[in-house]
């Protein structure tokens, strides 16, 4: 499985999960709770009684597109996108949640399955063809980031519309080592895999969570180690 870390504001995910009750999500972090109430204002004076409160929202998504399965994995509510590379020439991301899940952001792997006979693989590599493909994506991601552990990112709306990055400040992200906008739709995943992700995101995922595809959704590249070293 290969793909990206997709990140949304946690307040958006709360709203998608709870609707009008999203104002009842309280983490104890003043900045996070203020952001949640700004998105979900209420005139109700909420009780601090635990029965009146809701946990930070999470999600799980899955769809099949042709021969590929696309799904979210390791969803991290109130979390952070973190580096998971083992060499400076690679760029690999993962996700984590704090124990209190009180970050402004929520992230999850958004990956597509790749079979051992997939045309995207170089079959001349034999038994090492999947690992070779994984490493090639990680090296491409490092180049797109520009080095120094900077992560290449793209707004999900630009990815699905196949739009190049605009000259504007990089999007907000929990990734702490810096982000750089890139054309992930063109320069990272092979077209069949990118197209499958695009169809799942705009189809099944958007139907399940209206608002999943939006300017607030940011793809971080690349997620390659859900089931590989």
Cite the ranges covered by each PLM segment.
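Residues forming the flavin
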Residues: 1-229
């Amino acid at each position: 499985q290969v793909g990206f870390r997709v990140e949304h504001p946690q307040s958006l995910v709360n709203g998608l999960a709870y609707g009008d009750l999203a104002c009842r999500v309280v983490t104890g972090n003043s900045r996070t709770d203020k952001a949640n109430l700004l998105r979900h204002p209420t005139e109700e004076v909420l009780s601090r009684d635990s029965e009146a409160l809701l946990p930070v929202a999470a999600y799980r998504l899955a769809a099949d597109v042709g021969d590929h399965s696309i799904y979210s994995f390791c969803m991290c509510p109130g979390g952070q996108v973190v580096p998971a590379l083992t060499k400076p020439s690679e760029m690999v991301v993962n996700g984590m949640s704090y124990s209190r899940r009180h970050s402004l952001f929520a992230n999850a792997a958004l990956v597509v399955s790749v079979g051992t006979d997939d045309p995207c693989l170089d079959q001349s590599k034999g038994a090492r063809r999947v690992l070779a493909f994984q490493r090639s994506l990680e090296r491409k991601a490092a180049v797109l980031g520009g080095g120094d552990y900077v992560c290449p990112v793209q707004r999900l709306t630009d990815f699905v519309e196949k739009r190049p990055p605009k000259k504007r400040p990089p999007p907000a992200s929990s990734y702490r080592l810096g982000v750089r906008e890139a054309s992930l739709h063109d320069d990272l995943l092979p077209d069949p895999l990118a197209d499958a992700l695009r169809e799942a995101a705009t189809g099944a995922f958007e139907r399940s969570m209206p608002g999943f595809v939006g300017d607030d959704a940011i793809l971080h590249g690349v997620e390659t180690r859900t089931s590989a070293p």
